[in-house]
From Swiss-Prot:
UniProt-listed InterPro entries: Spc25, Spc25_C
Coiled coil: 62-174
Entry function: Acts as a component of the essential kinetochore-associated NDC80 complex, which is required for chromosome segregation and spindle checkpoint activity.
GO biological process: cell division; chromosome segregation
Protein name listed in UniProt: Probable kinetochore protein SPC25
Example of a GO cellular component annotation carried by this entry: nucleus
Alphabetical list of Pfam families matching this protein: Spindle_Spc25 (PF08234)
Length: 272
């Protein structure tokens, strides 16, 4: 606050001076206290105090309002932060539960992987053993195939030789046998007719039953029933064949004397 300016400039004051100057005309001393300037000064001072107080009150109210708002904002921020912390705690709990579940899953997967690796090792060992066994089997099969091929070649050579010998024997004997049906034998005879040595005389013998039968004979033999009865009696098929050949030869006028190797065959001996 600026100092108040008085109307009368200040003068050096002393008690003696004050007493002389305050002596009135009637001889009674009087003291001039200059009340009005002082009063104005006091009023100005009081007004300044009132203004300061009002400004202070206004400032206090404004600050209180700001403080209340700040406290309210801080409370809201605190509540929001607490909610965020709670959410973070819940999220952390869920995350920990998820991590625990994943840990169990990883443990199970590791156990399964270990089991699979152990199984794979066993399978590899078994596969190696099987490969070795397979190689051994292949060698044996190859050796067996080579032996079988050798035997097949031998059998083929023997078959070719037997076929040639059989053909030569059939031509020499004038007799050929082949199966036409189950348990039926077709017998062809040649070298019977001297005018036509290649002429065939044939007969079919059915041996499928206990009683033999002849379903076909070309050319027919008049004594065939007797020959069949004799066959079923003595069960000597070779003797039956010789008797049939003789019967075929008897069909030719003026049959020649036996001249084939078949006629010279004696056949197996049988006791009746």
């Amino acid at each position: 606050m600026a100092p108040t300016t008085y109307a009368v400039p200040p003068r050096p004051a002393s008690l003696h001076f004050l007493l002389e100057s305050s002596t009135s005309k009637n001889g009674v001393p009087s003291l001039d206290l200059r009340w009005e300037p002082f009063q104005r000064h006091i009023e100005s001072f009081l007004n300044a105090i009132d203004a300061y107080t009002q400004a202070a009150r206004t400032e206090i109210v404004a600050r209180a309002t700001d403080h209340t708002a700040a406290v309210r904002d801080l409370k809201a921020d605190k509540e929001e932060m607490e909610r965020g912390i709670q959410l973070q705690r819940e999220s952390e709990g869920e995350m920990l539960a998820t991590l625990e579940a994943e840990r169990h899953v990883v443990a199970d997967l590791n156990a399964s992987l270990s089991h699979l690796q152990s199984s794979l090792t066993k399978i590899k060992e078994k596969s190696s053993a099987l490969d070795a066994e397979l190689q051994s089997e292949r060698k044996e099969v190859k050796a067996m195939q080579a032996e079988k091929e050798r035997q097949t070649n031998v059998l083929n050579n023997m078959r070719e030789r037997d076929t040639t010998e059989l053909k030569q024997l059939e031509e020499a004997l004038g007799w050929r046998v082949e199966g036409i049906k189950q348990d039926q034998l077709l017998m062809r005879f040649t070298l019977i007719d001297p005018e036509d040595p290649a002429r065939e005389f044939s007969i079919i013998v059915d041996v499928s039953k206990q009683v033999y039968s002849v379903p076909n004979c070309d050319p027919p033999i008049p004594s065939l029933p007797d020959l069949v009865r004799q066959l079923n009696f003595d069960r000597d098929l070779f003797a039956f064949i010789k008797r049939v050949r003789i019967a075929f030869r008897a069909l030719i006028p003026n049959p020649p004397n036996p001249s084939t190797k078949f006629d010279d065959l004696t056949g197996p001996s049988r006791s009746r």
